[in-house]
Amino acid sequence: MTEAIKERVGALLATGLRNYWYPVLPSWRLHAAPLGITRLGENIVLWRDKDGTLHAIEDRCPHRGARLSLGWNLGDRVACWYHGIEINGSGTVTNVPAVKACPLEGQQCLKHYPVQETRGGIFVWFGDALHSEPSPLELPEQLASDDWASMLCTAMWECNHQYAVDNVMDPMHGAYLHARSHSMAMGDKQAEMRVKKTPHGIMFEKIGQREVNFDWVELADTGSMWMRLSIPYQKKHGPGGSFYIIGYATPIDENHVQVFFWRCRKVSGWQRDTWRFLYRNRLEGLHWEVLEQDHVVLENLAPNARQNEFLYQHDTGMARVRRMFEQKAEAQLAALDAVAKPSATTV
């Protein structure tokens, strides 16, 4: 890889790989008014129409650049606060009320984003110029099956999203950073680990220890890039066995990330109700304590920590994921370059 390509790959990874679905908000965060967000370095306005259908377009009025998120929700379109220009969910200007027969009307001026809502989260497709149409959003069993109950926890951290991915791909830190937690106080402080291929990615696991601590983690690519792990739970923590977590690290910009963690257990009927009650009234606070430990460490890493590392065997899974991401970034850039390069003409 040349230095020029390396820089471009680094820049792409800093704000996130394209051509994936990313969770951008919990559902409860979007109310009647348009909402402006920044994700993957792109400014987006989201809103719901009268039927609850979601829309997402660039947060920029094509007239003079005002934020559409400061304007009004008109159902299937938003109106700019500055001059009242109306734009629909496809990014097309439908009305310029201040003048007659404005040539701006009817033009698709803004990028629109495919958007889906599931399991209490809002997902947006971030496609590059070659992939405006989304791939299917295929979620892991814990989110796709009604046999599982899930609750979403999300937080914003002041660090690059790659550090959040590194953190989840590092099971060994559970025995140290989270050693006094309600769920990761047991197990060996030393372990041998291995990488295993899965149908959609990799699993990184401790050898000879399972269902004792944070003993394994999986990363998979199924239209979105998700991570899965399980934490053993004692019977006093309610029915459903081990507690599964489905995690995402969505870039906000180069220096901020929003993490999403769906907490899942396989329960139904009265057991589901019991677990939800226990979680909301007892367990949720304990999990926030664990998450805050990760938060504090990641926000206080040494400057440019990734450029000054000495990795060892426990970092193998993390290193494999880093290389996987680099290869995907190289492939995305190469595909864009191939289209942009003028074709040779024969004389």
PLM feature spans:
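Short, charged N-terminal helix-start/capping segments
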Residues: 1-13, 255-265
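Rieske [2Fe-2S] iron-sulfur-binding domain
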Residues: 2-4, 9-10, 16, 23-149, ...
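Short, positively charged
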Residues: 13-17, 268-270
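Residues at beta-strand starts and edge strands
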Residues: 18, 33, 120, 243, ...
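Short small/polar-residue motifs
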Residues: 20-24, 42-44, 109-116, 186-194, ...
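C-terminal catalytic domain of Rieske-type non-heme iron oxygenases
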Residues: 53, 130-347
